[in-house]
Amino acid sequence: MMDPRQETCGDIVSTRKRRLEELYYVSLHPRYPQGLDAKQKLKQFQDQFDLTQNRLFDENKLPKAVEEPKPVPTLQTSTPDAGSSPELKRRRTSSIAQLSPTFSRTSLKTNEQQLQEMLLFLVPSNIPEPTTETKSLAELYYTTQTLPLSKLIPSAHKTLTTDSYHLALLEGKLAVAHARIEELKRAGKWGPRQPKRFQDPIRRKTHWDHVLDEMEWMSTDFREERKFKQAMACEIAFSVLEYHKYGKEACCVKTKPIKFLPEEINESEDTESKMDIDTSMPPPSINPVEVTNISAADSVTVVDYDTLLSQPRTLSSTEESEDKPEEPSTDSEEVVGGEVPKRPAAPKLPESSPFKLYASVDKLDPLSKALFDNLPVTTPPGSAVNALQVPYSDPLDNSKLAPVTHLLAAPPEQDDWWSVCLEDSPADEDPLPLRSNTRSTLFNSETMRRHVVIKAPQPPQTKYLDFRTPTMWLLADDSQLLRLVKEYSYNWDIVSAHMLPQKTYGFTANIERRTSWQCFERWFQLNPTFSLTDLRGPYAQAAQQWMAAAAKAQAQSKRRISPLGVSNESIQRGHRKLRWASMFDGIRKSMRKRETTPRPNPQPPRKSQLSESNKKDIASPLDLCKMKFEQDKNLAKAYAQQRMMPGQMPGQMPPVPSNIPANRQFPGQRPPPPQTAAQIQAHTQAQARAAAAASGHMQQRMAGVGMNRMPGQMNDQHQMMQFDRQRQLMEQQKMLQQQQQQQFMRTQGQVPPQPGQVQGQVNQNVQGAQVAAGQAGMAQRPAGQIPQGQMPAQQGQVPPGQAGNQAQMMRPNMRMRPGGPQAAAPNEHLNALIRQLQNQNPALSLEAATKLAHVQVQRFVQKQQRVARQAQGQTPPQGQMRPGQPQGQPSPQMRSGSSTPMNMQSPQLMNVQLQQQQQQRSASPGQSPAQQHAMLMRMNQQQQQQQQQQQNQGQTQGQNQGQGPSE
């Protein structure tokens, strides 16, 4: 069963295609009087002789006489052979009946008028036929614009073909052509007549034209040969069936039995007597051993053809009866009355059967002969004498007028290029006998209709009852529903399938839906005498409950819920066509109502906890990828440098690469805010706990994994852990130093300096230390040697005793001129030290490296000052105040002693210890990576315990110092 959507869309496409063809031909001949006259004449002829209504032609009005009628040939008689088979007799009898002169009313009337006139039309398909309904270009353009195929095709189901898409493109071309024509009309450049078509020069047939002709001929030849082979196969199948049914004696050709000659041939007997045809003589018995001795030359049977030709002609071959038409016999009663065994007749082939292997012109009636003589004969290409000199002619090029525009091309030609406009009357053919009862008793028996059971379909859910849209039923819909219900015996699914709207265009409105339940509900409204208690089936109780709920809801609601019957008087004009417009109108009303209805107060948007500065500093994924790449690159460089470090001395520092910028900063990175002492202490404790937990987790993991990991991976993990541990130790040392310094200053009654003040003081110390170191170096250089980057005016030597005082005197000047040449040198040394720390520890951040560099510079300055005082012998006691020092401020030695514990390790010493540990691990190749990792973890735990003890000792010392002045 074809899908209704598919059938509907196919009808739309074919109708639209036909209209476009009409537009093409109308545009081809817009005001051509001869074309209009030809159309009118052809239309008048079709109205007079309606071939679709099977009307006969009026021979008196036929325009032309073809030829005079030929006399009917007389039928010759012949005596049948008594020895023929029963099957041949039956065939002969049937052929006699077929060859009996049978004349229809048309043929008799034609013979009486002697075929004075005859009508035969061979119409090419490219000539337009008159249309029953012609539309103008403007109307067709309006139709294609209001409902174009380009919008209908995407919503179609299972009907998307190439022809449909081509038709949609053709509609677009039509719109362009119409717009151009209207533009020319407004400009006054569109004339009522078209210019004469340009005649192209005559061209000869090319090789491609000959190939196309051969292709057409081969197609026809193969098609006809296939038909002939099918007919031959059918005849062979019938012959095999007769052979198995009637046997060899009735179906095979009777031949004379083989007569074998003796060894000695009597030539006298052979010359005297002729060979006699005796079918009753049995074959002589011959010894098989003797037969083998007969030569091939003597085994040939001598046949006298003159004797055979002189005998009376008989039908001894089935091929003769088929190839040559048999003549009727006058003694047909003898043949029919003979003793013929009753056998079922073979399948009779009608005269118009395609399996007829021969056709005789003598069997045709005069009208058929006249038509046969006038039919065109198909000949192979190139059969003419001068086929190459024949000019090529295209029937489409012979048109006198050109198309309106190149956008509208001619429609493709059909396969049946010639259409014969002559049909036989159906009165000449005997109608087939109809059965008395053409309808099946499966659905039409009275007993079944009396005992039919009405089953209810599945009802919808009752919770959607309040939102239901009523369906509209016209009078035609009600009558069709009642007819389908009676015809299909209350099969609601089939009734629903037949009640679906024919033209849906991919959308069905709610008022046009015809589901199984809606059909049953409307049928129940049309039959008020039917009781719901008579329903049967699994959904009978649910249907009763739904009907009761629907009646109750309809009584309480003002809106229509049940189906609505509409009469013809109440239908508005163009009701079905305006349903889409009403649907869009309803959509617009609902949108307008939604806009006008007051909306509830929206909740205030939640403010993000991130400030604007934090949002700006958030790194993007690209920035994070770059940071990750830089970090991996630095780690790789550090690993490469460590592999090259065993050749250096233990205290020697690796060279500083010059390609790394001094002020390197990652994108999105900002300096951390200042932290209080409590935050620093909490951060230090959290890092210690995290390190202890990580070490414990790593021990458990290594204990579980064992020797499964590769040694290279274990070494990389050891190095990563060493760098992390070293960075944590440096940060903890810095935190402890700051805490002890702040605690000591609180005990002395001083305000602890801010991070900015501490940084400025450190810079001053670094600058003073660099100046003192430079002056000390100048004292040791020989005369005339100037260091790089120093002016000759600065070559004055300073005594060692005045180095510290001069450094203290130059600090205010350096603070006042931070951008001078003397301040640039310490900054360069400081940046070089920061780069060196970052190369040694790639995981170390820029801020931590800067802090470590300041600490090292401060220690270096203190050491230089201590060495200078010892050299001068002016080392003051610990509690003595220097001149110029404010009261209540501790001396530098006291500050350095209180801020730097005795057991605090420097980064250089820690690097030396790490190198020694690596050498110890490399010197013990017998240990596995897991054992080395466990040993390293134990060493880390011991260092953590020592640091904890140092912190406790520092806290007790600070408490004792705080209690001393108070006492």
UniProtKB/Swiss-Prot annotation:
Cited Pfam families: HSA, Myb_DNA-bind_6
Main location, first listed in the record: nucleus
Occurrences of domain Myb-like (ranges): 469-529
Compartments, record wording: Nucleus
GO molecular function, one term: chromatin binding
InterPro entries on file: Homeodomain-like_sf (IPR009057), HSA_dom (IPR014012), SANT/Myb (IPR001005)
Biased composition regions of type Low complexity, renumbered to the chain: 864-932, 940-967
Biased amino acid composition, Basic and acidic residues: 60-70
Acidic residues bias locations: 319-336
SMART domains attached to this UniProt entry: HSA, SANT
Domain HSA residue range list: 195-276
Record's subunit section: Component of the NuA4 histone acetyltransferase complex.
Function text: Component of the NuA4 histone acetyltransferase complex which is involved in transcriptional activation of selected genes principally by acetylation of nucleosomal histone H4 and H2A. The NuA4 complex is also involved in DNA repair.
Stated name of the protein: Chromatin modification-related protein EAF1
Organismal lineage: Eukaryota, Fungi, Dikarya, Ascomycota, Saccharomycotina
